[in-house]
């Protein structure tokens, strides 16, 4: 079913499927760890009821 004939053909198919889609801008909902001056980070984990 999925027989590879050449790696170039596979790369072309992958490029066509991906379409170079990606994250062009930074996601505002993404959480990022904040570091202090010493380079240490901390987080508070809260469990919802």
From Swiss-Prot:
Q: List the disulfide bonds.
A: none
Question: In the UniProt entry for this protein, what further remark is given in the free-text comments?
Answer: Interacts with the polymerase and the uvsX and uvsY proteins.
Q: What is the lineage of its organism?
A: Viruses, Duplodnaviria, Heunggongvirae, Uroviricota, Caudoviricetes
Protein's GO biological process: DNA recombination; DNA repair; DNA replication
Tell me yes or no: is Zinc among this UniProt entry's keywords.
yes
How it assembles, according to the record, is:
Homodimer in the absence of DNA, monomer when binding DNA.
* Xref: InterPro entries: NA-bd_OB-fold, Phage_T4_Gp32_ssDNA-bd_sf
Q: Name any one GO molecular function.
A: zinc ion binding
Cited function: Binds preferentially to single-stranded DNA and therefore, destabilizes double-stranded DNA. It is involved in DNA replication, repair and recombination. Binds ss-DNA as the replication fork advances and stimulates the replisome processivity and accuracy.
**Which keywords does this Swiss-Prot/TrEMBL entry list?**
DNA damage, DNA recombination, DNA repair, DNA replication, DNA-binding, Metal-binding, Zinc, Zinc-finger
Q: What is the protein name for this chain?
A: Single-stranded DNA-binding protein
């Amino acid at each position: 079913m999925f027989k590879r004939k050449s790696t170039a053909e596979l790369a072309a198919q992958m490029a066509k499927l991906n379409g170079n889609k990606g994250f062009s801008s930074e996601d505002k909902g993404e959480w990022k760890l904040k570091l202090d001056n010493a380079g240490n980070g901390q987080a508070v984990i809260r469990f919802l009821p």
